[in-house]
Amino acid sequence: MLLPVAAAAAPEGACDGVTVGAADTAAYFPLLRGRRVAVLANQTSRVGDEHLVDLLHRSGVRLTAIFSPEHGFRGTADAGEHVASSVDERTGVPIRSLYDGRTRRPSDEAMRSFDVLLVDMQDVGLRFYTYYISMLRMMDACADFGRAVVVLDRPNPNGSYIDGPVLDMKYKSGVGALPIPVVHGPVSYTHLRAHETG
């Protein structure tokens, strides 16, 4: 089950101009009540000045796992660098790396540790940006294990700009997983997934 929480224009008079999906807690907190929650997140997973994981922890959400993509949960690893699993110092929640050099798919044990997955990462609208690929792999694993997925959308900073050839799927890899242009502009995570599954 996929439940998107869209980003939206901020109310008139707001200084930021955009409300990210993670800030709309009224839309997704009811879906988390009484459930074990995992997040696929990184350093961009912010709600104002607070990290999404800290917000969930402070709000009493039963957070059982953090999945981290390339560059790690705090975004400190270099491109392509393998990142070990660890524990978040602030919350004590296990961080399960999807970029450890062994596998890019979570273990069966990790998948059994939660009921619903929140996805919240900023994408820049480039086909070779690996965050959407990590999300797709997690969504596939969630489908296999019957886990719900809630995508907390963020606006694409590339706006409506689209450029470059569409990926020929015979070249599908860890830096290109969908038949989309190099710069895919306004295509959100949810639309990427819908495109992949037809």
What residue spans do the PLM features occupy?
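Single conserved hydrophobic/aromatic residue that forms the stacking wall/gate
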Residues: 191-194, 198
